[in-house]
Amino acid sequence: MNIEILPAFTIPIGVVKLGPEFCEPLKKYKGIEQFEVNKESDFYVLDKIPDLKRKLIKLFSAYINLQILHTPNQEYTITTSWITENTTGKPMGSHNHCNSYYSSVFYFDKVSKEHPALEFANPRMPEGFFVEPLRTTLSNCRSFAAPLEEGLIIFFPSYLYHHHKGYEPTEVIRKSLACNYIPIGMYGQGDATLDTRTIHG
């Protein structure tokens, strides 16, 4: 007897390849060394490239509004944006993005086959018992390795923990632009209504 599996809940991760008009403006900016992030780091790089910032907001808004939430009039903005560089090949520790709704990572420069994929941890894996599956499926996987190629941008919910493994460094530095997004304007309903335009009076 075959038991039907119902995909009750899914976690959307959006992926699209962008052209040179998105990639080239970022290549002249120095990134943050992956393990030297501090309060002096530049977390607002897109404020220096307002046209690109507008394009990315428009791209994300179309994705989240038309394909995920079906809320065509909801507005969003990018809060923080920063370029990271890994010149040593050291692994990136697992983390998520606080004070953010969605996030993205954009591989705007050359990618080497040695560069490891970004891996997302499955937040729905039960704690305690661990029966190891013999075959990995969407129903039992503990992590998901996102695709990695030049020009690719990945949109994901900010609560997802993610990391990448260590690798042997090459002349091609692993670079990416990270962005955080939040909804703005009015959203919600009833006593859960929020209008960001009134927060500061």
Q: Where are the regions that the model predicts?
A:
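Residues in well-ordered beta-strands of folded domains
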Residues: 17, 82-84, 105, 119-121, ...
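Non-heme Fe(II)/2-oxoglutarate
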Residues: 1-73, 82-84, 89-91, 117, ...
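Short edge beta-strand segments in beta-sheet-rich domains
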Residues: 11, 78, 115, 141, ...
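A generic structural micro-feature
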Residues: 75, 96-100, 169-173
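Short beta-strand His + acidic residue motifs that chelate non-heme Fe in jelly-roll/DSBH
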Residues: 92-95, 162-170
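Catalytic core of non-heme Fe(II) oxygenases with the double-stranded beta-helix
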Residues: 86-155, 186-196
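Short, solvent-exposed loop/turn segments at secondary-structure junctions
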Residues: 21, 111, 125, 160-162, ...
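A short hydrophobic beta-strand segment most commonly corresponding to one strand
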Residues: 103-106, 171-187
